[in-house]
Amino acid sequence: MAAKDVKFSRDARERILRGVDILADAVKVTLGPKGRNVVIDKSFGAPRITKDGVTVAKEIELKDKFENIGAQLVREVASKTNDLAGDGTTTATVLAQAIVREGLKSVAAGMNPMDLKRGIDLAVTKVVENLKARSKPVAGSNEVAQVGIISANGDKEVGEKIAEAMDKVGKEGVITVEEAKGLEFELDVVEGMQFDRGYLSPYFITNPEKMQVELTDPYILIHEKKLSNLQSILPILEAVVQSGRPLLIIAEDIEGEALATLVVNKLRGGLKVAAVKAPGFGDRRKAMLEDIAILTNGELISEDLGIKLENVTIGMLGTAKRVTIDKDNTTIVDGAGAADAIKGRVEAIRKQIEITTSDYDREKLQERLAKLAGGVAVIKVGGATEVEVKERKDRVDDALHATRAAVEEGIVPGGGTALLYATKALDGLKGANDDQTRGIDIIRRAISAPVKQIAQNAGQDGAVVAGNLLRENDETKGFNAATDVYENLVAAGVIDPTKVVRTALQDAASVAGLLITTEATIAELPEDKAPAMPGGGMGGMGGMGGMDF
């Protein structure tokens, strides 16, 4: 075990604060519409240019182990805010720095750190209540676009594309961001349910130009197990042929003989048919097949449910208006499922999302939810160079998370004013003792930091701007850093998602509280490297040639 270095009280706290300041000072220059870029050197490839707080924070590693502890804890604030709200990482970092600075000053003045933390927690609870009370639900796609524009640093095209995507796939729909080949933004929307399984044989193709299978008004047979021969489904195949409608078979697999028979029947024109493998694996596959059954008003043919293939009737098959299959994906559009049944299934999946502890499971459940409730939209981000594409993609990701947060918990006026005006919620609030009251004052001061930093990045005096706003006492009014004007921020489209502001404050206060109550820090001592062997050959060996043997 390597030897450790231990620092105590004032020495420990000063080192931690230095680390906090280094990271926060690098991150906070990106805040607001006039925030600056940060260039990050890479060990390979071109440097990365970004205005994304969490990206900057993740790149910072300090040489001094004790300073690094402070930097890493603030980095944790940015990461946690990013995970929970997807945006607001720079605001969270600015708040954490402000709380730590004020808190450590108070500790140095002899106040009790535990009481300070209790006061901080009390004040944060009050501010969060105030934010929730002032929050307004998002009204229409125009406000969704505005949230996106603000989060993407004033990029109008980004906000509008996200609003359009949300319009098309709904609040539950999946929106993903990819890099495009060209220069422009593109939006691809997949209607209906899509899963990543293509046709089992190219002989099923009905549209050779697009290399796709297109089935109109098909029956859909959903089978949990493998199909190795068609003997058991001959009665149902005959019934489908007589109906004159196409058939889609979804099964775990369709093996040699069964597949060959289907292909021959398709080529002879007797049966319009296509077959695909079931999506997913294990229990997830069964759940996805049940989703498809509910969406298409069919039944999952499963021995667990006591249904055998021989007993399947045409009434057990699902139907849809259209099915499109290419070599990679199958898309079912306009399934005949009952709205109530689909709604019930959506609610069941939502409950599973709430109780699951695995991020992977949550992501897969959300995908299933989107496929049932909405659709899938892909925003493709273009640019002239790889560096530009990556920077724009960062902004689109931020904007997308911010708009989702806005839809979830509503919006408050932006530009840091929501927190600034929340200081009124702390008027008259007292702790159980003077130290707790000082903790409340720390939050009162800290929540004005984002407004001051946004103004400072715009070339204004932050303290003057914050003072002007508090003097005016008009909660709708704020400082629009993009135009250097005091105005109604909601009317001007400068709005923040309540969830982002709330999460930023809670995460910042949580980690700052831990730092304030730290009395000792432990870090590994750097190892002394052994001196290298001297270079050159072994001297004095040249005379060995004269030895007698």
Swiss-Prot record:
Binding of ATP, residues: 30-33, 51, 87-91, 415, 480-482, 496
Catalyzed reactions: ATP + H2O + a folded polypeptide = ADP + phosphate + an unfolded polypeptide
GO molecular function: ATP binding; ATP-dependent protein folding chaperone; isomerase activity; unfolded protein binding
Keywords from the UniProt entry: ATP-binding, Chaperone, Cytoplasm, Isomerase, Nucleotide-binding
Gene Ontology annotations for the cellular component aspect, listed alphabetically: cytoplasm
Pfam assignment, any one: Cpn60_TCP1
EC number per UniProt: 5.6.1.7
InterPro entries given in the database record: Chaperonin_Cpn60_CS (IPR018370), Cpn60/GroEL (IPR001844), Cpn60/GroEL/TCP-1 (IPR002423), GroEL-like_apical_dom_sf (IPR027409), GROEL-like_equatorial_sf (IPR027413), TCP-1-like_intermed_sf (IPR027410)
Localization: Cytoplasm
Family: Belongs to the chaperonin (HSP60) family.
Its biological purpose: Together with its co-chaperonin GroES, plays an essential role in assisting protein folding. The GroEL-GroES system forms a nano-cage that allows encapsulation of the non-native substrate proteins and provides a physical environment optimized to promote and accelerate protein folding.
UniProt subunit comment: Forms a cylinder of 14 subunits composed of two heptameric rings stacked back-to-back. Interacts with the co-chaperonin GroES.
HAMAP family the UniProt entry points to: CH60
The protein, known as: Chaperonin GroEL
The species this protein was found in: Rhizorhabdus wittichii (strain DSM 6014 / CCUG 31198 / JCM 15750 / NBRC 105917 / EY 4224 / RW1)
